UniProtKB/Swiss-Prot annotation:
GO terms for cellular component: centriole; ciliary basal body; cytoplasm; midbody; perinuclear region of cytoplasm. It is found in: Cytoplasm, Perinuclear region; Midbody. Keywords: Cell cycle, Cell division, Cytoplasm. Belongs to the ataxin-10 family. The keyword Electron transport does not apply. May play a role in the regulation of cytokinesis. May play a role in signaling by stimulating protein glycosylation. Induces neuritogenesis by activating the Ras-MAP kinase pathway and is necessary for the survival of cerebellar neurons. Does not appear to play a major role in ciliogenesis. Gene3D superfamilies: Leucine-rich Repeat Variant. This is Ataxin-10.
């Protein structure tokens, strides 16, 4: 068996000969494809990758340039490529993909001979929206994989790929119908992006790339690369998050907010940079909640149950509850202008709406945990009370605000069991505890309240029980069933 150096030199000589002969035209591309395939197989092994010289990559550049020229002069319907148009460049991309695996010298050679620029031009041809042929799609995918491998761990190559692919190639790939194209392009984007590049996405002319990442993630929620792009890069740039949110539709906002909630809820400790960025994002989302919170009242109408905007409001509230439950983030929202007032106000409005007519905000006593736990209104009042309690934790100023807004009586009026608001009673007790801690004024207010009889006991009756008050105490008694007639 020939030594690795000789085998590689032999395949390279074959390729050089093929390119120099008349048979190197389109009708004989199958021969060239076979030679490149053998080279691809060799590059699967590290020893051959390490022996590769720049002239090999110059030969592959010649092939790709020849393919590009052939496609340009071919008199074919738009997007209609022959198999030979696609199979040879696909094999070239596989060869380059293999050559760049954990091999910085090959990454440098690929970049230096101009293969990145030529490859991106050809990839864009195969990735045009009207191109639907499977062979072209395969070449498209292989080209993206090559770009990812040539950029991996190589800053200069990352910058070269970014210069050629941003924003047009990324935009066309992220909205592509093929899931693999979306996945591979997001891998390339993640590999190339850094803090400086993230900041450029805020430019209105470039923002569509960031928007497309979130939209693609909503379509493919198991796509790890898009998840990492948002978590590791977008969420470190509050200005970008703000620009993305303000440009999104309600369903897209829900996706972004769920990603933010996931970041806040993660168990791993945050870095100082992550913590600072999330606090800035939370302050922005606090303003959004105050602006949008009253749209939740649309849900009082049965016809509005499919509205997306109220779902956005519930996700905003989820985030605010989670942020204020962590001591390191609490103070940034305790001082947010208008947030506490908005929470008390919308609690009052939803509570009143539930009393005025039968709707999703009416307390339900069914012993079945509500009819639809996925409804946007489920848990909304409980989470409002949770937020109010968090904002008042060891904060005298906010305790006083709730007192002035008559919020204590409002919270106490929400202490009954409500299947539409799991743990409502517990969150109300928690909020009252935080409102009265080291606050004599609020304690005296509660102490001065008069007993007004028993609350609605329909739930007890449905269980065959009734409550009686005797000597200042409550007693539970079973209800005797009336004899059947």
């Amino acid at each position: 068996m020939a030594a690795p150096v000789e085998r590689l030199a032999g395949v390279c000589a074959e390729l050089e000969q093929w390119l120099g002969e008349e048979s190197g035209q389109r009708n004989d591309w199958a021969e060239g494809e076979g030679i490149v395939w053998r080279l691809s197989e060799l590059f699967r092994e590290a020893q051959y990758r390490e022996l590769a010289e720049p002239r090999i990559f110059r030969l592959i550049l010649q092939i790709l340039s020849r393919v590009s020229c052939e496609i340009k002069v071919a008199t074919l319907p738009a997007g209609a490529f022959t198999d030979t148009h696609c199979q040879l460049p696909a094999e070239c991309f596989r060869c380059l993909r293999n050559a760049c695996v954990q091999c910085a010298s090959n990454q440098d050679s690929v970049r230096n001979v101009g293969l990145i620029e030529e490859s991106v031009r050809l990839i864009q041809i195969f990735g045009a929206p009207h191109v639907l042929q499977e062979p072209a799609l395969v070449a498209f995918r292989c080209g993206l994989q090559f770009l990812g491998n040539t950029a991996a761990g190589n800053r200069d190559s990352q910058n070269a790929v970014w210069a050629c692919a941003f924003p047009d190639l990324f935009l066309s790939c992220l909205v592509h119908d093929d899931e693999k194209v979306v996945t591979y392009s997001s891998m390339v984007l993640f590999t190339c992006i850094n803090r400086e590049k993230v900041s450029t996405l805020q430019d209105p002319s470039k923002l569509d790339v960031a928007l497309s990442v979130v939209t693609a993630y909503s379509k493919y929620p198991d796509a790890e690369w898009m998840y990492l792009i948002v978590m590791d890069h977008f969420l470190l740039c509050p200005d970008l998050v703000k620009a993305v949110y303000l440009s999104q539709s309600s369903p897209e906002r829900v996706t972004l907010l769920e990603l933010i909630l996931g970041k806040i809820s993660q168990k791993e400790p945050l870095s100082a940079e992550e913590s600072e960025a999330l606090q800035a994002i939370a302050a922005f989302l606090s303003d959004c909640f105050q602006t949008q919170c009253k749209t939740i009242l649309k849900l009082t109408s049965p016809s509005a149950c499919d509205e997306e905007e109220p779902i956005v409001v519930t996700r905003l509230l989820d985030i605010l509850c989670e942020v204020t439950s962590k001591n390191e983030h609490l103070s940034c929202l305790q001082t947010c202008p208008g947030l506490l007032e908005a929470a008390v106000d919308i609690l009052r409005l939803t509570h009143l709406a539930g009393k005025q007519s039968m709707n999703v905000f009416t307390a339900a006593h069914t012993m079945s945990m509500g009819q639809d736990l996925t409804h946007a209104a489920v848990g909304f009042k409980a989470h409002l009370i949770r937020l109010i309690g968090n904002l008042c934790y060891q904060n005298k100023e906010n305790q006083e605000k709730v007192y002035q807004l008559d919020g204590i009586a409002l919270i106490l009026d929400n202490c009954s069991i409500d299947d539409n608001n799991p743990f409502l009673n517990q969150w109300a007790v928690f909020a009252i505890r935080n409102l009265t801690e080291n606050n004599d004024k609020n304690q005296e207010l509660i102490a001065s309240m008069e007993r007004q009889g028993l609350a609605d006991s329909s739930l007890l009756k449905s269980m065959g029980l009734q409550a009686e008050e005797r000597d200042g105490k409550l007693l539970l008694k079973s209800v005797k069933k009336s004899p059947a007639l």
